[in-house]
UniProtKB/Swiss-Prot annotation:
It catalyses: L-glutamyl-tRNA(Gln) + L-glutamine + ATP + H2O = L-glutaminyl-tRNA(Gln) + L-glutamate + ADP + phosphate + H(+); L-aspartyl-tRNA(Asn) + L-glutamine + ATP + H2O = L-asparaginyl-tRNA(Asn) + L-glutamate + ADP + phosphate + 2 H(+). The gene is gatC. It comes from Mycolicibacterium smegmatis (strain ATCC 700084 / mc(2)155) (Mycobacterium smegmatis). Belongs to the GatC family. This is Aspartyl/glutamyl-tRNA(Asn/Gln) amidotransferase subunit C. Allows the formation of correctly charged Asn-tRNA(Asn) or Gln-tRNA(Gln) through the transamidation of misacylated Asp-tRNA(Asn) or Glu-tRNA(Gln) in organisms which lack either or both of asparaginyl-tRNA or glutaminyl-tRNA synthetases. The reaction takes place in the presence of glutamine and ATP through an activated phospho-Asp-tRNA(Asn) or phospho-Glu-tRNA(Gln). Heterotrimer of A, B and C subunits.
Length: 99
């Protein structure tokens, strides 16, 4: 039984702002359906009596010394930007646009 439809893949693609062809929609629907099938199989495993684990490597807050290092100036950083305005990176507006 299919768990994800072609329309759901198209909806996800719109949300992610991906332009997919008809063939890609069909292909991804099958791939995502297979992935969900594997996840379902893993979820069905009986883990009664198995102790929960997290990260077996107990490294906590491994940090480097907080030292001042040379970095780009604002002008140098903005020089590499496709568009800048008022000393900031200018990017296309995305909030408030339809899905």
């Amino acid at each position: 039984m299919s768990q994800i439809s072609r329309d759901e893949v198209a909806h996800l693609a719109r949300l992610a702002r991906l332009a997919l062809t008809e063939d890609e929609l069909d292909g991804f629907a099958g791939q995502l359906d297979a992935i969900l099938g594997h996840v379902s199989q893993i979820q069905s495993v009986d883990v009664t009596g198995v102790e929960p684990t997290d990260n077996p490597l107990k490294d906590v807050n491994v940090t480097r010394p907080d030292t001042v290092q040379p970095c780009l100036t604002q002008d140098e950083a903005l020089a590499a930007a496709p568009k800048a305005a008022d000393g900031r990176f200018a990017v296309p507006r995305i909030l408030g646009e339809p899905e």
